[in-house]
Structures are given as C-alpha cells and as structure tokens.
Amino acid sequence: MSRSKSSGRWLQEHFNDQYVKDSQKDGYRSRASYKLIELNDKDKLIKSGQTVVDLGAAPGGWSQVAAQIVGDGGRVVASDILPMDSLAGVDFVQGDFTEEAVLEQLLELLGEAKADLVISDMAPNMSGIADVDQPKSMYLVELALDMAKTTLKIGGSFACKVFQGEGFDELVLACRECFQKVLVRKPSASRPRSREVYIVAKGYKG
C-alpha cells in the first residue's frame, strides 16, 4: 500500500475512533489514557498516595490518569525527549533518561523515595519495516525495564508497551526473573491490527 493511502486510512480511522472522541470529551490528552485506565481496572496498578514514574510521557495521557488516581498525597515523575505541557501533580523532566544529567534530575525528584510503579508507553518512530522497527522498540522496552530496576521499591510494579515479534519471549522471561507475576495484556483501546501489547509485571523482587 502506498504511503499516501496508508496515511489516509490512518486519518480516517483516527477521526472515526471512539477512543479519540472520548478523549476529547473526557479531557484526556490522548486516546492512550484509556489503555492505562483498562490496565489499572484489571490489575490494580495505581493506588492513592503512590509514587509513579512515567517514561515517554508526552503528550501526557498516562500521566493525567496516574495523577488523578494517586491524588494530592501521591506524585508522578514524568520524562520524555519531547516537550509536554504542565499537568497538576506531575513533575516533568524533558530529555533522554539514559543520559546521566537527565537521570540525575529524575532521581533527584524522587528523592529518598522509591517508585511504586514505573509505566512506559514509549514507541520509536515507525518506518513500517518490521526488521527495522522491532529492534528499536525492544531497545526502548529494555531501557524502561532497566529504569524500573533502578527506581522501583521491593514489591513495586511495571507496565510497558511492547510490540510482539523478535525478542518478545526473551523480554517476558527477563521480567519473570525480577517480578513475581508477569501478564501480557491487549487493552480494548489498542487498535486490533496493531502488534502492540502491554507487559504488566507485579511484585518486584529487587
């Protein structure tokens, strides 16, 4: 399919998408908010008063949901290489968290506290070529898992977007080594033809 036809199909799907319409009505910054809402409904990831780290946070759909649930007694520390408009209850650091200066900012915001939950909806810029896109996406997931190991408290949780393909089974095994329970979820808001799924890992072993 030509790129123009593919782009046209995406635009048509986007404007007809019920989750896009709902996000505009409900005041969420992206349809991705509903993915986290569903994951949380099923797996009870976020609780009032918790500390949450959101990686790849822009435009802020997941941070919005997390901040609403943790409330005034909790906090959300978010990061992205892209800018993000400020959100109540969210401390945002712009930059690549694999760079030492950015990581230090994030850890400084966390202070003595460890995170209860690390979430990541990161995805690379897709070329449409699976052999190119899959390694890029797996690299981002591995970075997110490393960050979770750095910041999570014992018993904490991790939720991360991943695309099924080469490296997926190995990633699930890697998560099982450091978490007590690992699930693979496909939220309703994930487009059916997408290879996108979410790993939900609970009970960080340390």
UniProtKB/Swiss-Prot annotation:
Principal EC category:
transferase
> Quick one: which residues bind S-adenosyl-L-methionine?
60, 62, 80, 96, 121
The entry lists its GO molecular-function terms as:
rRNA (uridine-2'-O-)-methyltransferase activity
According to UniProt, the reaction catalysed is: uridine(2552) in 23S rRNA + S-adenosyl-L-methionine = 2'-O-methyluridine(2552) in 23S rRNA + S-adenosyl-L-homocysteine + H(+)
| EC nos | 2.1.1.166
The protein's location, in the record's own words, is:
Cytoplasm
Active site per the UniProt annotation:
161
Instruction: List the keywords (alphabetical).
Output: Cytoplasm, Methyltransferase, rRNA processing, S-adenosyl-L-methionine, Transferase
InterPro entries (UniProt xref)? RNA_methyltr_RlmE (IPR050082), RNA_MeTrfase_FtsJ_dom (IPR002877), rRNA-MeTfrase_E (IPR015507), SAM-dependent_MTases_sf (IPR029063)
Show the GO cellular component annotation of the record. Answer: cytoplasm
Record keyword rRNA processing present: yes
What SUPFAM superfamilies does the record tag this protein with?
A: S-adenosyl-L-methionine-dependent methyltransferases (SSF53335)
Purpose: Specifically methylates the uridine in position 2552 of 23S rRNA at the 2'-O position of the ribose in the fully assembled 50S ribosomal subunit.
Query: Of which family is this protein a member?
Result: Belongs to the class I-like SAM-binding methyltransferase superfamily. RNA methyltransferase RlmE family.
What protein am I looking at? Ribosomal RNA large subunit methyltransferase E
Say which species the protein is native to.
Saccharophagus degradans (strain 2-40 / ATCC 43961 / DSM 17024)
